[in-house]
Curated annotation (Swiss-Prot):
GO terms for cellular component: cytoplasm. FMN binds at S21, K45, G46, N99, N127, K165, I191, G217, G243, G244, G265, T266. The gene is pyrD. Its cofactor is FMN. Keywords: Cytoplasm, Flavoprotein, FMN, NAD, Oxidoreductase, Pyrimidine biosynthesis. The active site is at C130. The lineage of its organism: Bacteria, Pseudomonadati, Bacteroidota, Bacteroidia, Bacteroidales. It comes from Bacteroides fragilis (strain ATCC 25285 / DSM 2151 / CCUG 4856 / JCM 11019 / LMG 10263 / NCTC 9343 / Onslow / VPI 2553 / EN-2). Its EC number is 1.3.1.14. This is Dihydroorotate dehydrogenase B (NAD(+)), catalytic subunit.
Amino acid sequence: MADLSVNIGKLQMKNPVMTASGTFGYGEEFADFIDITRIGGIIVKGTTLHKREGNPYPRMAETPSGMLNAVGLQNKGVEYFSNHIYPRIKDIQTHMIVNVSGSAIEDYVKTAEIINELDKIPAIELNISCPNVKQGGMAFGVTTKGVSEVVQAVRSAYKKTLIVKLSPNVTDIAEMARAAEANGADSVSLINTLLGMAIDAERKRPILSTVTGGMSGAAVKPIALRMVWQVAKAVNIPVIGLGGIMNWKDAVEFMLAGASAIQIGTANFIDPAITIKVIDGINDYLERHGCKSVSEIIGALEV
């Protein structure tokens, strides 16, 4: 067996395979199907300072080779997470990471401060694709100023590993990654969903209640792969790649492009065991290519 271990900030992971937020619940939901302790890291669903009801239905739509979602970060808030969910998941033998969202910088900071006190949560992932309600609704992650302000504020309040999840809905994602790195991010993950929409031609109405939503799945992979390659060349912190990873081969491609770890999202809805299959597939690939460690393929793309 090859050495699959990777480091993301202070996180020492047993392998580079993680689950994407919003596609794996709190991990416990999958425990009847697979050995979830084999996964390198589980990123739980988005958590906000206060309870959120989410968007009205319909808020999901299937598309060719993908899906659209506009769930709207439905969750019961960070206090509920700390008091009711954390006690259930804290002893799962893998890294449990919390995805943090907010509608103002102080929301991110307060949420991060609360999670910082949870001993067995070693990292957070900042979702900066959220609209800043104090700045006319523009997402934090679409300008270097917005990225810098939220990352810097959270970094000052949060002492563990800080992962920043980047939006692809920008002109230059490498600039956003550099801004995150300059303001204290330990790692960047990309890509978040692409903005898309679906229309019911007979009704002449949008399918989603919000009109637009986030697109994920196999169709976005070439875009995600290109962005990971660009960002990996632009920063000196570990890059976590995601977007359309449906099998082990996709995962290997992201690592060749420069990702130190990968996240599996939409594929979890299709095959609950996909994470385990990808872990085994990466190991088989390394052995076939005579690699003793997964580090040998990170950024090994020959251009």
